[in-house]
Amino acid sequence: MKYAIVYSSRTGNTRQLAEKAFEVLGEREGGECVYFGEVPAGPLEGATAQRFREAEILYAGFWTDKGNADSGILSLFKELGKTDNMPPEIILFGTAGFGADQAYYDRIIQAAACELPESVKLKASFMCQGKMQQGVLERYRSMLEANPQDGRAKLMVDNYHAALTHPDGTDMAAFQHFLISSVPAAGMGE
């Protein structure tokens, strides 16, 4: 089975997951990666468009922005939907600064899935916590300075620090297990 792995990563979290997917899927018998890399800039043309057209399944990784996939990956979905370049199945994976809440992860996946062309089947999804940029911590600290009794801001600062090690070894092991269980080895799903 031919597959493509595309990702968008601001802090490197989602890139780590994409690299793990490339490694794990590359070890699977019967699969061929036709594209691996960041979301292409601009319209899909030429060889890049052909690679997406060849893929039977797309692994699409994103970072979370305001409760949805980031604009880069959403733009790719729109671009693929305008043409016949979209693989028939997709597996979404991503990272979010706020972790340990499966219901939150489910809402993010649901929001991202709503952006997919109707012809595409969401086969599976995976989310884990990821570290955030320093500017996020500074924003939360400003909130606390303005109101030292702000429990929500305190919670956000604590969460920022908890996220610094993610994706960690446990996250990566869970992602590897997810990948292996999502696509059978023999023929990679045929």
UniProtKB/Swiss-Prot annotation:
Pfam families: Flavodoxin_3
GO terms of molecular function: FMN binding; oxidoreductase activity, acting on NAD(P)H
Pathway: Porphyrin-containing compound metabolism; protoheme degradation
Function: Together with BilR, catalyzes reduction of mesobilirubin and/or bilirubin to urobilinogen, a key step during heme degradation. BilS is probably involved in electron transfer for the bilirubin reductase BilR.
The name this protein goes by in its record: Flavodoxin-like domain-containing protein BilS
Organism, as annotated: Clostridium symbiosum (strain WAL-14163)
